[in-house]
Regions:
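Membrane-embedded translocation segments of transport machinery
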Residues: 233, 237, 250-284
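Conserved phosphate/anionic-ligand binding catalytic regions in large, soluble enzymes, centered on
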Residues: 21-37, 256-273, 314-319
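Early transmembrane hairpin of solute transport permeases
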Residues: 29-128, 132
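Acidic-glycine-rich active-site phosphate/pyrophosphate-binding loop
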Residues: 1-12, 45-59, 234-253, 285-303, ...
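Hydrophobic alpha-helical bundle architecture
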Residues: 38-41, 67, 278-291, 301-367, ...
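A structural signal for small-residue-enriched, beta-sheet-centric alpha/beta enzyme cores
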Residues: 2-3, 22-26, 53-60, 64-67, ...
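Signature of multi-pass transmembrane helix bundles
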Residues: 110-253, 419-425
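Flexible, glycine/charged-enriched surface loops at secondary-structure junctions
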Residues: 45-49, 90-95, 117-118, 194-200, ...
Length: 425
């Protein structure tokens, strides 16, 4: 693929748009971002807060610890953090810098200011509305479809920004429908590594740091440490353990940032950390490692384009399959090995549900990475799943399309039932 090719430029831009830093689980951070923006527009601390959130937002915020809040959980905590300490210009790092005094003020704010939460359904899976009030004055902010996409800013009946939300589109982002496995393969083999060094290099640095912390500290169910203590430290176990350890830390209050993928820190770690571990094991060199990471990241984004940002379909599954693709490439695999790895992995663990962001995400990540590695080893030994084996159909693109259909359409009712269970808990 030539540098002058429009797809080459688009793939570089997609990586830059998707591989961005975020501090804390991205759904509560998006809520904190909306709250910080609303407070900025209001111009003072509010004396009442009203929050509307779609079911998938409620699901992903309910059980996860919001960083820099002294281990608070839930929607009110995320909103309070944004209102008290949020720096709007930092977007998904909106509460990365919080003083001890601000943490104390958050707790006091939660005790003294009424914060209402309403489940809203406006036909958009990703939907957040924050209204902050002071006396007769108010400010309102809406985020829709992706984490930093502010579509409405209103103060005292005056609309300062009003972008129509027409279904689940991602206006302003590079067209993800340009992605396909054949072109991704062409791109990663021809890309000038200098064009991706900064964006991929930051992922290596950030995600390695949080995996290290997850293995050193005591976070959640410590899945990463359990894997190493139980199964030893061969490269396959380390690949699973380090991805899980990053999630252990991230889901349970660690204040280190990660580089996300498809709007998710867990997916960003899942499609990068196993690949890094294999690259180090086989001493592949920086250039091959960067190409493998470009492959795994773009493969993950490609799958999520059909599934959507939030779904009842666990995003670790698509990221684990993508990690398998990157590992296959590092181990000397060609295009056939890569695409069969993806299909095999999807056949193994597709259907694992997302029941929100919380400690058990780390174990789901480990299972998904295991499926990615198994999918590759199957094909190495002449084994594979064929068209007609469940949701597997002829060709990698057709199978990925089926996964998108399953995640976006087929699991809608599953998502609704999970949300009902969590709201009524």
């Amino acid at each position: 693929m030539e540098k002058t090719n429009e797809k080459y430029k688009a793939y570089i831009q997609i990586l830059k748009e998707e591989l961005v830093p975020a501090m804390g689980c991205t759904e509560p951070i998006a809520l904190a971002y909306a709250a910080a923006k609303a407070r900025e527009v209001l111009g003072c601390l509010p004396d009442a807060v009203e929050i509307g959130a779609s079911g998938s937002i409620i699901k992903n915020v309910k059980s996860v610890i919001v960083p820099n809040t002294n281990h608070l959980k839930g929607i009110p905590a995320a909103a309070a953090a944004g209102i008290i300490a949020g720096k709007v210009e930092k977007e998904l790092e909106v509460i990365a810098e919080v003083s001890e005094e601000e943490t104390v003020r958050m707790a006091e704010f939660l005790k003294t200011v009424p914060i209402s939460v309403e489940h809203i359904d406006q036909g958009v899976t990703f939907d957040i509305i924050v209204v902050v009030k002071k006396g007769d004055s108010y400010a309102k902010v809406r985020i829709a479809n992706y984490h930093t996409n502010i579509v409405l800013v209103e103060k005292d009946e005056e609309k300062l920004l009003d972008i129509p939300v027409e279904g689940e589109t991602e206006e302003g982002l590079t067209d993800r429908s340009l992605l396909n496995m054949e072109d991704i393969w062409d791109f990663i083999n021809s890309v000038d590594v200098a064009d991706i060094r900064e964006v991929i290099g930051r992922q290596v640095e950030y995600n390695t740091a949080i995996a290290d912390e997850g293995l050193k500290g005591d976070y959640g169910a410590n899945i990463g440490s359990v894997l190493l203590e139980t199964y030893g430290d061969d490269v396959r176990t380390r690949a699973k353990a380090r991805a899980a350890a990053g999630s252990d830390a991230r889901m349970n209050g660690c204040e280190l940032p990660v580089i996300i993928n498809a709007g998710s820190g867990n997916q960003g770690m899942t499609c990068s950390l196993p690949v890094l571990e294999y690259a180090r094991e086989f001493q592949c060199g920086e250039e091959k490692m960067y190409r493998a990471l470009a492959l795994s990241n773009l493969t993950a984004i490609h799958q999520k384009t059909g599934i959507g940002r939030l779904s009842a379909y666990c995003g670790a599954v698509s990221a684990g399959a993508a990690a398998g693709a990157g590992i296959a490439y590092l181990c000397g695999g060609g295009y056939e090995e890569v695409i069969h790895t993806v299909v095999n992995a999807l056949a193994i663990v597709s259907g694992m549900v997302c029941d929100g962001a919380k400690a058990s995400c780390a174990a789901k990540i480990a299972a998904s990475v295991d499926a990615g590695i198994l999918g590759y080893n199957m094909f190495l030994r002449g084994q594979q799943f064929y068209a007609g084996d469940g949701i597997v159909t002829k060709g990698v693109e057709a199978t990925i399309s089926n996964i998108g259909r399953l995640g976006k359409d087929g699991m809608k009712e599953t998502n609704e039932e999970i949300i009902k269970m969590m709201i009524n808990d």
